[in-house]
């Protein structure tokens, strides 16, 4: 979850370090720090602060660290609470070495005991601090050789940048299971844990892979593997618009990203439907009927919002392709001894492509012999590189912690995948396929239409925004969307929200329904519509306040609810792409009503890179 930046060049490092860390705020953090080497004083100056980056900027405002080489870090506490001492960068006993690190050093306790016995004095509770002390131990005049000795001692997942006072023009970085990128400039080079940190400075990058070690100077980058053998890297040209990481006139990134969904969905669909709507085109996969028919089962593995997308994906693949699907929470999958064979397909879903539990589950599935595929939004991410095949969602950068456009584009890819498999298996009639894909083409315009009328949702948020509890109900696909709506509300407004399959009300949930409790009820699935109405009547009979979500043309729901939010009519398989929109907006405006930090909700991070 941490953010890492590094700079070496002819310019003052501090300015870039703060700028780069600001671009990584979406990753979540509780403290920040920078270390800059000053050639005149021949010293590494470290400055840290708990809280937002603004606190660090305020601290150094009147005395900015001077120097042309430095490293910076935003920390999300894992070992030791948020404090100045636990913040990065960390140094050794002499102050000659500084290190920033993202991830976990699993064997740090044993290393720490060893170092303490050797006379080293530790200042923090972190696992990271063993790194500069190990570097101090092994340094004998050769910075790179010392780093390699350190790397041979540590176990875990990490991205690390090392800095040495004795090597004032050199940073050394490496990674294992955590992202790291090098930006290539003119007379300067940059290091970051994610591309947004450097995009304003350069579009030419090296994506660092696991086990690679990069020696970064202002005019050169030398990359080798752990054995010291040179690696030739291809320059990756970033084609993002630099303005894509800005709010674009919206009050919050989340609201901007909600309104970017028509474009994000359109981009994700682009080139993936035949011109006559007869078939799905996924050139990334190039599957054959024989290959798809070999699947005895599909696993979908993800966390959080991506898990909810996976639940909808299960419905799509089973309904269209008629292949059994099991959906797993990534953090549970690898510990339950799943039954996997070489005729199993494992699909992992992650917006960032760096979710550590999902990455670990992917590796476990591969170890067990499964074919693997990733659905992710970030080209060159760890999950994208680890999976056998990748289908990208073209959502563009998503900055707000609460995922919106990543979710809808994940649903698009899941539907495309189900239809693609169905086409190869012959499980959907041609006329039905054309009908579905034709309606899918209309979804971006229907999303725009849905997002136009937000005033009723604002009113609901203001009216019910201070309730302690909110319940969401639905059946079939409506239930899966209800789960996502509940998550959105709780994560950014801090309201206790729960989603239930409407048919489960009598099995316990009904005991919680009392006068005035808001209940959001989705009723768009025709096959279970009457049963859903019956469940809505049950909560209404307990004096709940019911907000219904229905397709335009529904003339029944308003009779049993206090309010109804309508979305455009489409096929019931596709309607989750529309019904989730008012739930996203309801969460946003409720959080706004309650004065919450919409883009950076407490205790949460955008990219979860520790288990």
What are these regions (language model features)?
Residues 545, 558-560, 570-611:
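Generic C-terminus detector
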Residues 154-188, 460, 465-491, 528, ...:
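Acidic/histidine-rich
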Residues 261-265, 269-299, 379, 389-518, ...:
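Active-site phosphate/pyrophosphate-binding segments
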Residues 68, 72-85, 276-289, 313-349, ...:
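Glycine-rich oxoanion-binding loops at beta->alpha junctions
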Residues 293-442, 524-565, 586, 594:
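Glycine-rich phosphate-binding loops that contact phosphosugars or nucleotide phosphates
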Residues 1-251, 260-296, 335, 430, ...:
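Conserved short alpha-helical segments that host acidic/polar catalytic motifs at enzyme active sites
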């Amino acid at each position: 979850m941490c953010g890492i930046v590094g700079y070496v060049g002819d310019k003052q490092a501090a300015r870039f370090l703060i700028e780069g860390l600001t671009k990584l705020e979406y990753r979540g953090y509780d403290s920040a720090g920078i270390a800059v080497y000053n050639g005149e004083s021949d010293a590494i100056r470290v400055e840290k602060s708990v809280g937002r980056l603004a606190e660090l900027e305020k601290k150094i405002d009147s005395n900015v660290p001077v120097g042309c080489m430095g490293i910076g870090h935003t920390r999300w506490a894992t070992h030791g609470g948020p404090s100045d001492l636990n913040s990065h960068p960390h140094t050794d006993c002499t102050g000659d070495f500084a290190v920033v690190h993202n991830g976990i050093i699993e064997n740090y306790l044993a290393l720490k005991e060893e170092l303490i016995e050797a006379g080293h004095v530790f200042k923090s509770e972190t696992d990271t601090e063993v790194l500069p002390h190990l570097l101090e131990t092994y340094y004998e005049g050769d910075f790179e050789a010392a780093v390699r000795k350190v790397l041979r001692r540590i176990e875990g997942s990490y991205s690390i940048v090392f800095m040495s006072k004795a090597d004032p023009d050199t940073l050394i970085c490496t990674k294992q299971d955590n992202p790291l990128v090098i930006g290539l400039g003119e007379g300067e080079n940059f290091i970051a844990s994610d591309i947004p940190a450097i995009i304003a400075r350069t579009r030419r990058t090296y994506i660092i892979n696991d086990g690679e070690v990069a020696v970064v100077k202002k005019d050169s980058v030398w990359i080798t593997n752990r054995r010291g053998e040179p690696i030739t890297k291809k320059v990756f040209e970033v084609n993002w618009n630099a303005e894509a990481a800005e709010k674009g006139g919206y009050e919050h990134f989340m609201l901007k990203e909600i309104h970017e969904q028509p474009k994000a969905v359109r981009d994700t669909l682009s080139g993936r439907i035949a011109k006559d709507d007869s078939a799905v085109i996924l050139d990334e996969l190039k599957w054959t009927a024989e290959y798809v028919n070999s699947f005895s089962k599909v696993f979908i593995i993800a966390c959080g919002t991506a898990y909810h997308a996976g639940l909808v994906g299960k419905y799509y693949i089973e309904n269209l392709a008629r292949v059994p699907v099991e959906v797993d929470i990534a953090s549970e999958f690898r510990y339950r001894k799943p039954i996997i064979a070489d005729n199993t397909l494992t699909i992992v879903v992650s917006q960032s492509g760096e979710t550590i539990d999902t990455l670990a589950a992917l590796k476990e599935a591969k170890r067990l012999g499964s074919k693997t595929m990733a659905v992710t939004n970030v080209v060159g991410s760890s999950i994208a590189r680890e999976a056998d095949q990748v289908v990208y969602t073209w959502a563009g950068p998503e900055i707000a912690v609460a995922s919106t456009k990543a979710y809808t584009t994940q649903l698009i890819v899941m539907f495309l995948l189900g239809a693609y498999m169905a086409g190869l298996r012959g499980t959907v009639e041609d006329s039905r396929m054309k009908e579905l894909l034709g309606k899918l083409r209309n979804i971006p315009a229907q999303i725009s239409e849905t997002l136009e009328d937000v005033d009723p949702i604002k009113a609901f948020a203001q009216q019910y925004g201070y309730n302690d509890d909110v319940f969401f109900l639905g059946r079939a696909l409506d239930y899966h969307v209800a789960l996502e709506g509940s998550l959105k509300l709780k994560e950014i407004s801090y309201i206790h929200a729960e989603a239930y399959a409407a048919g489960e009300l009598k099995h316990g949930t009904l005991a919680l329904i009392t006068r005035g409790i808001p209940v959001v009820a989705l009723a768009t699935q025709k096959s279970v519509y009457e049963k859903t109405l019956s469940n809505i009547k049950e909560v209404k009979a307990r004096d709940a306040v019911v907000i219904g979500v229905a397709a335009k043309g529904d003339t029944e729901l308003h009779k049993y609810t206090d309010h109804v939010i309508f979305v455009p009519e489409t096929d019931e398989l596709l309607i989750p792409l529309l019904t989730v929109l008012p739930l996203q907006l309801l969460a946003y405006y409720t959080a706004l009503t309650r004065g919450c930090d919409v883009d950076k909700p407490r205790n949460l991070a955008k990219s979860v890179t520790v288990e």
